[in-house]
Amino acid sequence: MDFNLNDEQELFVAGIRELMASENWEAYFAECDRDSVYPERFVKALADMGIDSLLIPEEHGGLDAGFVTLAAVWMELGRLGAPTYVLYQLPGGFNTFLREGTQEQIDKIMAFRGTGKQMWNSAITEPGAGSDVGSLKTTYTRRNGKIYLNGSKCFITSSAYTPYIVVMARDGASPDKPVYTEWFVDMSKPGIKVTKLEKLGLRMDSCCEITFDDVELDEKDMFGREGNGFNRVKEEFDHERFLVALTNYGTAMCAFEDAARYANQRVQFGEAIGRFQLIQEKFAHMAIKLNSMKNMLYEAAWKADNGTITSGDAAMCKYFCANAAFEVVDSAMQVLGGVGIAGNHRISRFWRDLRVDRVSGGSDEMQILTLGRAVLKQYR
């Protein structure tokens, strides 16, 4: 197996390094994190590089560069301190619409290409339906040639700024035999109320509660086929979990390098703390976790490019990387000592972000259940 990046991948990675060195992005990220604001200027800079075209097929003007290239770019962005969690819709969001959307829906979403603006997100989670998606209560009901959406969603990412959301709802006309369908909803429609929620980490991407009170839709607003909602979101979940895992690795690598530089410079008892065996042990364990994450992610990316990735693979990446990355950042914070927990060091942001990732995008427990079933299924 060749672990070297090809020329195209090297070019992308070099471009990322150049962009990250072009200005003091960390000050901008710290400000956006503090104020819970989407870093649109940074995302626009990435879009100008073509990052939002990485997975778009060539026939639609994209680069069709594949998941291995995406992994290389994501890892480098994270290693250099970028909040890649704000980019989850950037590589795959267009493709979702190219596969499932009507031409009108595709045109609306593709208009955001290259802008850096948030364009859409899925609204699935509800107050009474988190991991148990099947218990959702939001309904769509047909009356007089129109569709009416009623219910509430919670913890919906990006929804404070995005102009469109894809809402999962059940057919109100068949409560005993639920039909789950998705709807493409313009957030400016009457009857929609958005309440922004505060959260511990991932603060540059909004998290909101959304209520729908007789929101009027048309049949043309259906996203995909009626009754196919669950099948589509399963694919979206796998894609999201892989991207979350990539983000986890990059963030952990950045914290590791920050701590390593500090350990070689910080002098106590007459020598650099990096010469103490207890500190060296921490770095040995961190390096093992980082290398394991990297190899797992590149294997998953290769499988994605070759059409063999499974939900079990995505769950494994999400669970292992979320936990290993949090452990790395926690150890790095311990090495930094007071510097890490006081003042404005970015590691405190990393720590908060990674703790949230063990819940968002699918909890640790759900990943274990998914993976356990997938493993045993291979031996039936």
Swiss-Prot record:
SS bonds (residue pairs): none
Record has Cytoplasm as a keyword: yes
Keyword hit for Oxidoreductase: yes
Record field: temperature dependence: Optimum temperature is 40-45 degrees Celsius.
Bilayer-spanning residue ranges: none
Catalytic activity of the protein: 4-(trimethylamino)butanoyl-CoA + oxidized [electron-transfer flavoprotein] + H(+) = crotonobetainyl-CoA + reduced [electron-transfer flavoprotein]
pH dependence (record): Optimum pH is 7.8.
Inducing factors: Transcribed during anaerobic growth in the presence of L-carnitine or crotonobetaine.
One term of GO molecular function: acyl-CoA dehydrogenase activity
Signal sequence interval, chain numbering: none
InterPro entries in the cross-refs: Acyl-CoA_DH_CS (IPR006089), Acyl-CoA_Oxase/DH_mid-dom (IPR006091), Acyl-CoA_Oxase/DH_mid-dom_sf (IPR046373), AcylCo_DH-like_C (IPR036250), AcylCo_DH/oxidase_C (IPR009075), AcylCoA_DH/ox_N (IPR013786), AcylCoA_DH/ox_N_sf (IPR037069), AcylCoA_DH/oxidase_NM_dom_sf (IPR009100)
Cofactor: FAD
EC number: 1.3.8.13
Phenotype caused by lack of the gene: Deletion of the gene abolishes gamma-butyrobetaine formation and increases L-carnitine production under anaerobic and aerobic conditions.
Primary location group: cytoplasm
GO biological process, one term: fatty acid beta-oxidation using acyl-CoA dehydrogenase
Broad EC category: oxidoreductase
Biological or metabolic pathway of the protein: Amine and polyamine metabolism; carnitine metabolism
Record family assignment: Belongs to the acyl-CoA dehydrogenase family.
Subunit structure: Homotetramer.
Annotated protein name in UniProt: Crotonobetainyl-CoA reductase
Species name: Escherichia coli (strain K12)
